[in-house]
């Protein structure tokens, strides 16, 4: 059956696209622990995707059968590149395309992309239209923020007029980054806007939600269709499980997950990806138990997967 946001059971829980974190390896770990309803890739630059020698860029679009349904998130400023990228993505088995209009990173915003598009609605509309034209009827969504400097519901209203299949809103402005609590008090007004302007657009809220149980409360309070969980999975790989008993892991369970992550990384990427970026995941698994800090320090000193395995095995045998 063709994927449709509207056919998903409510509330919908999605895994956020997070740069340098939610690659296919980590998504598969989450899928085996407690799967979300929808997965997103890391954001992929449209011009990079179309360039020759795009191996590193296309790695971002790698996924497995267990990561379904999966949405390809793309970003950039050139509308023709969005059109061509959408054509390419439509042949790759993805269930939808999401346009990043929310990343607050300074160098990207300076180029007028991602959150920079909040200040350029004409280009934002052109990009949405071109992506839709190239996508061969794949669902189109946008992930954005409440505004650039201040909360701007006119921006949300504008997006709701673009006939999107889904709109994911990080409930902070670009200026706020993640430095203040998310503005969940705005969600009800946004739901009312959606009901008035575009009743068929699915609304997903994002910001400060650690797990499904917190998300259920937010949905109850706001009337949103679903919740996107991001950093919560770094604290708890079982963030998408409603079973609270699964959120408390033993030391052996945590370290077994790390070993699984190492094995999967090696199997999927081999020599394609270097070892150092893998170290950012150590803190996810090596925390909250006696001598965790010392173990993490030793792991950070390793230079390859085999060395990391040796350190882990020594710790578990001690």
Spans of features found by a protein language model:
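Flavin-dependent oxidoreductase catalytic cores
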Residues: 1-318
